[in-house]
Regions:
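C-terminal structural segments of small proteins and small subunits
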Residues: 64-89, 93
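Short S/T/G/P-rich N-terminal loop/turn motif that feeds into the first structured element of a domain
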Residues: 1-57, 65-72, 99-100
């Protein structure tokens, strides 16, 4: 299994919405991927960050069968649609993938 963690900082305003509104939309669209991509075993997203250093506004944690499944997820058209939105509203991104 491979765990994929991503932390984003968001622009104060983008796409006519506040960072909080865009964070809520990110949570909605990313969690909607559950059960839709083969090899994606678990996904959770939070825009309710208690504390983070460095600062982040949204965090994603997903688990995949293996590295091939992670690569499939990352290239999947439904995931790419999420990526297109996130790129418009995010100002920064940090990610880590590791075997569990």
């Amino acid at each position: 299994m491979v765990r994929h963690i991503v932390m984003w900082t968001l622009k104060e305003e983008a796409e006519g919405k506040t960072a909080a509104e865009n964070g809520a939309k990110m949570k909605e669209i990313l969690e909607a991927l559950a059960g839709r991509i083969e090899g994606l075993r678990h996904i959770e997203v939070s825009a309710d960050i208690v504390a983070a250093d460095p600062e982040c506004h949204v965090i994603l944690c997903s688990e995949h069968d293996d590295v091939d499944a992670l690569n499939h997820y990352q290239g999947h058209p439904e995931h790419q649609a999420c990526v297109a939105f996130v790129k418009k509203v995010a100002s920064g991104r940090k990610a880590v993938d590791y075997v569990i």
